[in-house]
Amino acid sequence: MPSLFSSLKFFCFSPTKDTSDKKIKDEILKKIEVNGGTVQYCIQKFSTNYIILCNGLDEYDRDQHYYNFQSNSLLFLEKSKSLGIPILSYKFINDCIGKNLIINDLQGYKISNIIDETIIKFEYQEPEEEIKEIQEIQEIQEIQEIQEIQEAYDDFFDLFGLDSAPIADGDVFKNMPPISQVLAEKAKEEKENQEKQEKERQEKEKKEKEKSKFKSTYISDRKLAMNQKTSPTTTSYFDNEIDDKENINNNDDDFDIDEIDFNLFSNIDLEINEKPIEEDFNLFNIGHYDDNVNRNIKTKSKFDNLNNKIKNNGYIFQFVNKDVSLYHEKDFPNNFKSIKLFEQSSKGLSCMITEDNRCYIWGNIKSNQKVEQLADHYQVDYCSVGGSHSVMIKRGIHTVGLNKFGQLGYKNGNTNCIGGGGNNKLMIENQIQRSISIINQNFLKKVLMVSCGKDFNVLLTNEGQVFSWGKNDQGQLGLGNSDSKENYEIKLVNFDDPYDSNSNKFISFISCGGNHSIAIESNSSTDGNCRLYGWGSNSQGQIGEKYSSVPILIKNQDQKSFNWKSPLVLCTQDTTIVVETPLKCTTFGVKFNSFLMNLKENFQDLTQFDIVVLKKRIGVLVYDEYLKASFLLRSLNYNENYHYQLIKLIIESNKFQHSHAVKLAKDCCEYGNLKVFKLLEHKFPLNLIDPVTLESPIHYSTLFNNNHLKSKIILEYCLINKIYSIDQLNKQKETPLHYCSRFGNYEIATILLVRGCNRNLKDVQGQTPLHISVSQTNHQLSSLLCKHGAQSIPDKTMKNPLQYCSADIKSNLQNILFTNEVFISYAHKDSEFVNNLRSNFGLFSLRCWLDEYRLQAGCNWRAEITRGVVNSDVVVFVISETSINSLWCRKELKMSKKLGKVIIPIFLQSVQIDPILYGLFTFIPKTTKKTFKEMSEKEVISNVSSISNLIHSILNGTQDSKLLTIQQQQQQNFEKSVQSLSRKEFFDKCYLNDKNSGCYLLFNNADRILFDFICDKFKENSIPTISSDEIIGRPSDQDDQFSLFNLMKQKKQNSIQRKKNIELEKKLKLENDEKLKQQWKIKRKIEKKLEKSKLIPSDPNYQYLENYLIQLYNFKNDNENEINENENNNNNQNNQNNQNNIIQNNYNYNNNNNYYDDNDIPILNNNFNSSELNNNYFSSSTTIQIEDSYNNNNNQAIYYDDGKTSEEEFYKQLLIEKENEKYHSIQPLKEFIKNSLLMCILFTRKTTKTEIEKYCLQIEYAKSFKDEKGNQDKTIIVITPDLSLKDNQNTPSIIKDLVWYEIDSKNIDLIFENITLMYEVLEKTLQISNLVNNNK
């Protein structure tokens, strides 16, 4: 038979480690295994069927089970909800086994919630009927409790003379009928008396300011009683104060808080003896605190952590994943400005100090009990809340709440303490102190801050000392012991090292968790770093590695203290968070990784925020002006009225600066908040541009692709109102369209294109938006750009966008790019107007072809222009003074006319047009009184709109016939008026064309690429050029040594020569090695000969024999080498004369061999002469006679036909012949040099010495021409890519004296604009001089 749980898998856990829970768990595990079930040791998503809770109790007191309690219960609950696996009571297993079946109805066993507070409570899912009964019982009990507490509240209000204020939402007193009636009546009275109350309050404040200063002294209950007996004025003061307070109501109708003035506790005008308190009444053995006494208090710089915490004002936010929201603003007073300090316990008991130092306290003490919301407490310095109590600092220590462990500062059950109207106290079960009590009147040290734990408190004085009181069962007071007794007396926490008598710890900041405390010691080392001390519970490692009931130094893994500089410290229930910077955070205990990650992403330094403990999570109290406004704007619970008003207050304040506005404008674009953006624009008109990046709000609107619908709101507002330029450039010369291409924002790019942005502006890298979109592989956006006029312009690497595309995308974009509806013909002087014209045409979906973007250096510009005219349907000619005289513009128009294109002129300037040019136009737009140059921007757009409509009608084949008739009549009338002019008058109105024109170019063949580029630039500027290529003819690739063919050939020859050199080096090395080998052999032979001679080294014959042998063998070796060399020479037939010498040397060598044998000692002949061993060398001298090619004979005469002899003419003819001989090499060029207006020399580092000589010769010839006044007639300039060549010593002075122009990628347009202007001046001058000469 199959087992009951055979197919089921269970995961079991118990909430504590107690023996009772452990026993239940073991029994359940055995029962599951016996019945065939599988026990798992972790929850698995797809296999676990049930999660079983093995609990002996339904509620666990954390104080009793603290060390045995396991904190995984809440994690199991969250995991069960996320995976959909139910958590059941162990009774489910017992009932299933008892009934022998799997129970399907789980309502009676399911755990619906786990309440993790002081009591760990497991709530079960009750059946529906039982739930209804329980709800009815709970309602009855709540009504009874409300009625009982209602009476106590009425007594409380009567005692304090206060009206019962409305209670916050969720309060158990909310539904009390008597209070609601009283509230309604009081609300009416407050509205009627509002103005009167305001005047009274203002008068009272003036009186308080006029009062003389006095010292405040806190005394014990016993001392106060004595003074009351002797001073009747004291009693009357309290009575009057209470009576006066009855008339003071909260003027703000929206406040849900009762008001208690802290002046009741501080500014008490008593006649008190200033003598020291007697010992009987001095409960803490501390004398009076005198403000004038010098207590050697350290400087306030020690309290940097505390000062940063209390000097700023802000708002509280909480992170929800990566989003942010304003924290529970409904629980706060409705009209407070901002928060200085905020704390909240896990039960919801909260305290807050606002910007005007008012203190508010509200929230739960237990699940069914709440402290009434206390109103503004003036001049409160500090406050803190624990689990069920609160402590405030205001010239003393004030407490309120539960006093189970003496955490209020007095013995449990004692209600006889001063404050809030004498001894009148209200108690509501379990020692809950509902009114504020002043404790420890004789504690006369100045308190700077206080921090509350769960049931204990720690305070810090201005002397850097720490005191504590309250519960101490886990050593949380730092007194060196742990007990469960009441510790209501304030005691000093000792930080001194018992082994170091000089140790004197100065504490600057404190923070308390659930049952542990942390203190910061400032400037504890010479490097200015801070050190952390901790004590109390260490259940989760929140104070380091070990538990301690006294302060211990928190160390790292290397047992060294951490090095922090003014860190931000916060303690939660079982965690210590230390933040040195938002990027450098350390946690001890339970981790909060997501919260720390949000800190890193949203903050830069600690001055911008503080960390606060909220009921269910950790929040941030934001101080930074920008971050406050930004978080409000980004808040998930954003309210158009409430949040907007808070943001408005922030923006209108003086603290809100321009840098804040720039960043907030970016947030407005991201979240589409136009109202806040208008606020920013109102305060900083036209000044929301980032001063660092130069980004405008139009740039910001392109950054958020996911929120393009929200960004669109800000974008259209800026464009419609023309607040910022649509082509605003940032620091990298990027426009908003560049940003759209980079971030793929198709929707925003469409808006920018429709609004007429410039499609072809380049950034610093020379890239257009089309470059970027193609490189981002955004084909949809690339096609959009091409359809709206983006051109294929090269970047700085001379690559156009199509070169970055794949083959299929490239063909698609090419089809779009080369289908241009409009071809614009213009002069380059009018390029600024033409760019605007192209942009305006783009507004009406017309693509335009411009040579500025199509023609590049090295391309076939004739073919490109021809392709542009052929692929277009309409040609627009821009008429100006320059364009009507441009030869290239006329050629373009003539070609368009031949191809049958429609030609439409646009009058940029009012000029007279000759009939030939006029006859090329197809349409003449309606003439206006103004030219385009004289029109405003709106008028230009209006006229372009009409021309665009005409072009669209032509493209669609629906042009207006009436328009044609009018234009034909205009053309006929114009032709008639032209025919009435005489031929001479017509030519007088036209520019004269003379043969003396153009620019003569000199260049080196090595610079042919640069020369071609310069020629194209001259042609773009309508300057005719001529060079040796046109005169002599461009050399072929084989004749040109710098052609690609010859360069490759030279490279190949160099490679062959390199190989030969390597082989030669190897051969020489072998020969050298052989030579060394021969020398070694000779040496060995000589040594052997000497050994055979049996001569000793001291013998004179030994030395003679040794020298003889060395000379003999060397001679033999030299002759052998010479023979080999001569044989090689003989084979090559290089030298015939050396052959006889070789034979003679061989003969001498053979004769010398008769005198010795290699194996014997040589026989010395008496007739031996060493001179016979020498070689005889013959030399001959060659005499070269140089004859003069020209013999100048002064005595010789020249005879002419007339028979006369003229010595003067002879010398003149001689000079002419010499000049002709000097310029003979440039004979073909002389005529063109003479007829040119401008002479341009290309001079680079590749220019050879020969070319420089040619340059000098041609320059000298050009300078030989003089005008009538004897001045130089030719203008000569030098173009160079390197201006330092002008100062080079190798550059001839005749070239140095000329005008030099340096060209590079940045100023090339400006250089040629200047050259063009120079040429036009020369041309005009020539025309005027020709006219003058013709008139003569």
From Swiss-Prot:
Region (Disordered): 186-213, 1120-1140
Entry comment, domain topic: The TIR domain mediates NAD(+) hydrolase (NADase) activity. Self-association of TIR domains is required for NADase activity.
Role description: May regulate responses to pathogens. Required by to respond appropriately to bacteria during vegetative foraging.
The keyword Chloroplast is annotated on this UniProt entry: no
ANK repeats: 732-761, 765-795
Domain spans labelled TIR: 818-935
InterPro entries to which the protein is assigned, alphabetical: Ankyrin_rpt (IPR002110), Ankyrin_rpt-contain_sf (IPR036770), BRCT_dom (IPR001357), BRCT_dom_sf (IPR036420), Ran_GTPase-activating (IPR051553), RCC1/BLIP-II (IPR009091), Reg_chr_condens (IPR000408), TIR_dom (IPR000157)
GO molecular function, one term: NAD+ nucleosidase activity, cyclic ADP-ribose generating
PANTHER family: REGULATOR OF CHROMOSOME CONDENSATION
Keywords: ANK repeat, Coiled coil, Hydrolase, NAD, Repeat
SMART domains the record matches: ANK, BRCT, TIR
Active site (record annotation): E892
UniProt KW Repeat keyword: yes
Disruption phenotype: Mutant S cells are killed by an avirulent Legionella strain that does not kill wild-type Dictyostelium. These results indicate that, although TirA is not required for S cell differentiation, it is critical for the effective response of S cells to bacteria. Show growth attenuation correlated with a discernable loss of cell viability. In addition, tirA mutant cells appeared to be more sensitive to killing by Legionella.
UniProt biased composition (Low complexity): 1126-1140
Renumbered ranges of RCC1 repeats: 412-462, 463-522, 529-581
Swiss-Prot/TrEMBL induction comment: Down-regulated by Pseudomonas aeruginosa, PAO1 strain and up-regulated by PA14 strain infection.
The protein, known as: Protein tirA
Domain BRCT as annotated: residue spans: 1-110
A cellular component annotation (GO) from this entry: cytoplasm
Catalytic activity from the UniProt record: NAD(+) + H2O = ADP-D-ribose + nicotinamide + H(+)
Coiled-coil stretches: 179-218, 1047-1084
SUPFAM superfamilies: Ankyrin repeat, BRCT domain, RCC1/BLIP-II, Toll/Interleukin receptor TIR domain
Biological processes, Gene Ontology terms: asexual reproduction; defense response; defense response to bacterium; phagocytosis; response to lipopolysaccharide; signal transduction
